Amino acid sequence: MATILLVGVDLYFRAKLEGLLPAHHVVTSDSVDSPDVVIADIARIEPEEVADAYPETPILGFTNHTDTSGLRRAHAAGFDQVVVRSALVERAPQLVEELTA
């Protein structure tokens, strides 16, 4: 079981991710648990700040398919994986498994 920190994720999508990742412990930034993976909503955060805050933790960023600027910024910041929101919904367990392997 991985501890997954959600950064900038709205409550609706948090509930969706918790349903998609029932085998993992999903927390928010106010948690004291050290994360194994960070999942960040690129449209709601600054990718560089998240990458700087978690330099040793794998980061999975997501946004909508029209946010090409956000996708580029997350890649440039060094996120380990950057996907569109629909791909995260389709492949969340596999993406987390790849990042924690």
Question: Model regions: which residues?
Answer:
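Short, charged N-terminal beta->alpha structural module
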Residues: 1-27
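Structural motif
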Residues: 6-11, 39-44, 62-64
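Phosphate- and divalent-cation-binding pockets in alpha/beta enzyme and binding domains
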Residues: 16, 69, 91
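Short acidic low-complexity segments
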Residues: 26-34
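Output/docking surface of receiver
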Residues: 29, 78-93
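Conserved acidic residues
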Residues: 36-37, 80
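Mid-chain, well-packed structural core segment of small domains
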Residues: 43, 48-81
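Receiver (REC) domain switch/output surface
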Residues: 94-101
